[in-house]
Amino acid sequence: MMSSKSHFVALLLIIFLIVNVQSTRIMDDSSDCVFKGPCQRRSDCYERCGLKPPSRAALCQPMGLQGRVCCCL
């Protein structure tokens, strides 16, 4: 009985830590992105970011209700 209680407490602690880390990430407003306008795919962002393909410093990421936006790193 005691081991099942300790397993339960350990599980709760792990869940608490995971939720806490996730909420910290969500609340972090700092961003390395410079947003440069709408896009449909990554290739749309190369010119906006001033990069040449196949650079990985340009992303086309979802931005809420605004659709997808170029993120220049």
UniProtKB/Swiss-Prot annotation:
Kindly state which keywords UniProt assigns to this record, in alphabetical order. Answer: Antimicrobial, Disulfide bond, Fungicide, Plant defense, Secreted, Signal
A Gene Ontology cellular component where this protein is annotated is: extracellular region
Does the UniProt entry include the keyword Signal?
yes
Q: List the disulfide bonds.
A: 33-72, 39-60, 45-70, 49-71
Q: Which GO BP terms apply?
A: defense response to fungus; killing of cells of another organism
Family designation = Belongs to the DEFL family.
Q: What is this protein called?
A: Putative defensin-like protein 270
